[in-house]
């Protein structure tokens, strides 16, 4: 993913080493369980599940692991009951941060998220205090090294399938879709044999904040690192232009 890309930087992601990949698989496993319980085990009839499966594949989760996760969620009435929880708040200099969690203990999660903000000189706000600064969009990132298709052909393939935008970055192509068109665009690219580095519905900031003060940069890094280390945290979105 391009280090200079705004889209690539909207979410603070863990490095994909072996330990981090294990955490990512655990997080996706929780998402699969919640999606199946909410809408059933068939991705064709469960849009949320289809999104999670796409995310799992983009993170190289083996198909048999995905299938086992779906079957377990569909047939195991004694599995852990995870609930969704979303927190919004402010980092240094008014940076906006959204934290999405899946948890079996909302009190624990709320305390941990609040602690992360506090340690980075930030603050938790009320629901909706920063989400209006973001747009929900489908986002597909393709590494140029993994793509044999010409950029123009790839762009036409994506736009014909319903994509809103196509960006040619330093070392990646980035495709943006409306949430409702995401699955169709992803499926069209998959059918064309395109390998995707990531594919998910995400939150894209409408504007970005540049931090110049070293203390602010240290503090927002502390917030994001603490949130990354929390197993209950699934996604973190922010408008800091790293």
Swiss-Prot record:
Coiled-coil annotation reads none
Q: What is its main location?
A: cytoplasm
SUPFAM superfamilies to which the protein is assigned, alphabetical: YebC-like
| Taxonomic superkingdom | Bacteria
Gene Ontology biological process terms in this record: regulation of DNA-templated transcription
Q: What GO molecular function terms would the record report? A: DNA binding
Q: Which UniProt keywords apply?
A: Cytoplasm, DNA-binding, Transcription, Transcription regulation
Q: Which InterPro entries does the UniProt record give?
A: Integrase-like_N (IPR017856), TACO1_YebC-like_2nd/3rd_dom (IPR048300), TACO1_YebC_N (IPR049083), Transcrip_reg_TACO1-like (IPR002876), Transcrip_reg_TACO1-like_dom3 (IPR026564), YebC-like (IPR029072)
The answer on whether this UniProt entry bears the keyword Transcription reads yes
Annotated Gene Ontology cellular components are:
cytosol
UniProt cross-references to Gene3D superfamilies, sorted A to Z: 1.10.10.200, 3.30.70.980
Location within or outside the cell: Cytoplasm
- Pfam families linked: TACO1_YebC_N (PF20772), Transcrip_reg (PF01709)
Family statement: Belongs to the TACO1 family.
NCBIfam families documented for this protein: PRK00110.1 (NF001030), PRK12378.1 (NF009044), YebC/PmpR family DNA-binding transcriptional regulator (TIGR01033)
Name assigned to this protein: Probable transcriptional regulatory protein EUBREC_1961
- List the taxonomic lineage: Bacteria, Bacillati, Bacillota, Clostridia, Lachnospirales
């Amino acid at each position: 993913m391009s280090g200079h890309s705004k889209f690539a930087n909207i979410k603070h992601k863990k490095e994909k080493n072996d330990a981090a990949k294990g955490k990512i698989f655990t997080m996706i496993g929780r998402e699969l369980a919640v999606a199946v319980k909410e809408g059933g085990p068939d991705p064709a009839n469960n849009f949320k599940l289809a999104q999670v499966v796409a995310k799992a594949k983009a993170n190289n989760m083996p198909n048999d692991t995905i299938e086992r996760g779906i079957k377990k969620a569909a047939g195991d009435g004694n599995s852990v009951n995870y609930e969704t929880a979303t927190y919004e708040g402010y980092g240094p200099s008014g940076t906006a941060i959204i934290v999405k969690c899946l948890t079996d203990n909302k009190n624990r999660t709320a305390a941990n998220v609040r602690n992360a903000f506090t340690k980075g000189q930030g603050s938790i706000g009320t629901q909706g205090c920063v989400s209006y600064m973001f747009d929900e969009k489908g986002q597909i990132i393709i590494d140029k090294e993994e793509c044999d298709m010409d950029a123009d052909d790839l762009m036409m393939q994506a736009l014909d399938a319903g994509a809103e935008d196509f960006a040619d970055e330093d070392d990646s192509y980035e495709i943006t879709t409306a949430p409702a068109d995401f699955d169709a665009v992803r499926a069209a690219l998959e059918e064309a044999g395109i390998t995707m580095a990531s594919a998910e519905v995400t939150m894209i900031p409408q504007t970005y904040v540049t931090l110049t003060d070293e203390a602010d940069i240290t503090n927002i890094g502390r917030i994001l690192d603490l949130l990354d280390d929390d197993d209950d945290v699934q996604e973190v979105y922010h408008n800091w232009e790293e």
